[in-house]
Regions:
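N-terminal flexible/basic segments that precede or flank functional cores
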Residues: 1-29, 87-99
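N-terminal positioning helix adjacent to the helix-turn-helix/winged-helix DNA-binding module
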Residues: 31-34, 73
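Short basic helix-loop element that most often maps to the first helix and adjoining turn
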Residues: 34-48
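Conserved hydrophobic/aromatic packing and binding residues within compact polymer-binding modules
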Residues: 35, 49-50, 60-63
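Short amphipathic alpha-helix starts
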Residues: 49, 53-58, 78
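Recognition helix of helix-turn-helix/homeodomain-like DNA-binding domains
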Residues: 55-70
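DNA major-groove recognition helix of helix-turn-helix/homeodomain DNA-binding modules
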Residues: 73-90
Length: 99
């Protein structure tokens, strides 16, 4: 069973301002802080978010700390996470329950 708390979309939307969320939906990740904000918006730990995205925690940390930048398909997945956080949360919950 997943230890992710159930939050409404409205509660999730309060985590980051709508102006920042709009930039993220457009794939405008100006800094590692934007990716960290998105992860917090989705409501997952680094390990959970990395698993849901199909990347290593090391890669996610590099993005969040600004050492590397997501490209191509990773940006598309980040946009999906910004638009549909519940889908990402459901994905990780199903992965964790299957383990």
């Amino acid at each position: 069973m997943s230890d992710i708390p159930e939050l409404t979309d409205e509660q999730l939307a309060r985590v980051i301002p709508s102006s920042v969320r709009k930039r993220l939906i457009l794939g405008q990740f100006d800094s590692g802080e934007d990716i960290a904000a998105l992860r917090c918006f989705v409501g997952l730990t680094q390990a959970q978010f990395a698993l849901a995205m199909g990347i290593s925690v090391h890669t996610l940390r590099n993005w969040e700390q600004g050492r590397r930048h997501p490209e191509g398909p990773a940006i598309a997945l980040l946009r999906i996470a910004a638009r549909h956080p519940r889908i990402i949360r459901e994905n990780i919950a199903s992965i964790e329950s299957a383990a």
